[in-house]
C-alpha cells in the first residue's frame, strides 16, 4: 500500500504482519499471488493463488478476495489497506534441496529493484543466500557460519528494496544488509 504498512510493521517487529506479492516463474510459465502472514509463535504462513501469467503485476478481484480472506481468518480483522504495487524486483534464483531432512537453500543473484522513480541494481557478484531448516542449524547454516557469513536479521528483499529505492527513510535495522549489498541510501541520515 502507498503508506508502506507492511514495511513499517516488519521494521517495528509487529507480531501480526503480512506481506503481499506476486511471483512470476519465467521458466515454469507460472504466476502466483501470495500472502505471507506471521502466525502464532512467529511461524510464517503462506497462501498462494494461481494467476494467469499474462496478468502478472495485476492483482485481480479473485486474488484480492482470497488474500483478504486469509488475513481475516488468521487475525480476526479486515485488511483495510489498498493493495497496489509499489515496487518490482527481478533476480535469478538457484534452489538447493537436501536429499534428506527437508533442508533447502536459495541463492538469489542479479537483483534489480524498480519503482516508478527509478532502478537499483545489485552488483552481480553479490548474492542473497537464505537457508530454510527447522532450527536454523542445518548443514548450510553451519557451513555459512564457518565461512563467517552470518545472517542479517529480518532483512526481506521487499524491505531492502524500499530502502534502496529511497521510498522509506527509516531503515536502521536493515543497515547490515544494505551495507553487504552496497546499497545504503545516501539521500538522508537514517532514523530509528
Regions found by a protein language model. Name each.
Residues 1-192:
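Phosphate-end processing signature that detects enzymes handling 5′-triphosphorylated RNA
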Amino acid at each position: 500500500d502507498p503508506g508502506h504498512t507492511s514495511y513499517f510493521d516488519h521494521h517495528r517487529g509487529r507480531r501480526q504482519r503480512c506481506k503481499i506479492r506476486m511471483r512470476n516463474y519465467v521458466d515454469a510459465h507460472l504466476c502466483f499471488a501470495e500472502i505471507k502472514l506471521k502466525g502464532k509463535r512467529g511461524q510464517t504462513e503462506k497462501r498462494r493463488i494461481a494467476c494467469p501469467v499474462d496478468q502478472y503485476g495485476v492483482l485481480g478481484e479473485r486474488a484480492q478476495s482470497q488474500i483478504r480472506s486469509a488475513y481475516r481468518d488468521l487475525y480476526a480483522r479486515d485488511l483495510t489497506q489498498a493493495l497496489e504495487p509499489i515496487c518490482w524486483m527481478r533476480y535469478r534464483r538457484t534452489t538447493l534441496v537436501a536429499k534428506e531432512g527437508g533442508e533447502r537453500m536459495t541463492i538469489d543473484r542479479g537483483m534489480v529493484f524498480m519503482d516508478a522513480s527509478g532502478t537499483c541494481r545489485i552488483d552481480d557478484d553479490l548474492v542473497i543466500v537464505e537457508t530454510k531448516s527447522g532450527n536454523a542449524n542445518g548443514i548450510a547454516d553451519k557451513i555459512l557460519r564457518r565461512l563467517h557469513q552470518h545472517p542479517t536479521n529480518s532483512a526481506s528483499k521487499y524491505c531492502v528494496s524500499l530502502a534502496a529505492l529511497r521510498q522509506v527513510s527509516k531503515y536502521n535495522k536493515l543497515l547490515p544488509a544494505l551495507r553487504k549489498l552496497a546499497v545504503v541510501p545516501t539521500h538522508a541520515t537514517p532514523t530509528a
